[in-house]
């Protein structure tokens, strides 16, 4: 134990089942699918699960066999592929959560560079979990593009068709608040950092949250 944190090196699936957790962050190399069942079972009655997926070829539709095998879904490589990738991952999480009587509520979701990153709130509720598929559907590629409960024509999915963000949380993620929380104190910066290094660090923080608060209502609709 160091600074109140217990560090353990071992099999993640085994470790996650040894105690209930209120917060789990899955960030494996490649697909997180093999860890989801253990992680979701390990979340307390109410808890946060964060998941990163770097197998974007499967999620974005260019590796269709892998997508079908891992996610039970299919994508299309077009202007919607990044949104599809995010929603396909959320759909799988929602399905596995429902298997364990838990409902999923997205907090934040993004596609950045070569990975998908989602944060979700999980709550134990048989009633809500029973209706998990109300937000599962397909993106139909016919004008106007739209979500539908059943596939037809050219489509991607199945995927999560509900909100991607929690508007209340995302609406508070302003650049000013991010700098306040994440920039740290000057005394904590490495001694060899110049003024340029500090400014670069702050710009990266700004970039990570830019437009989120302004888009909160749209993305939570």
List the predicted regions and their residue ranges.
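SAM-dependent transferase fold signal centered on methyltransferase-like domains
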Residues: 1-221
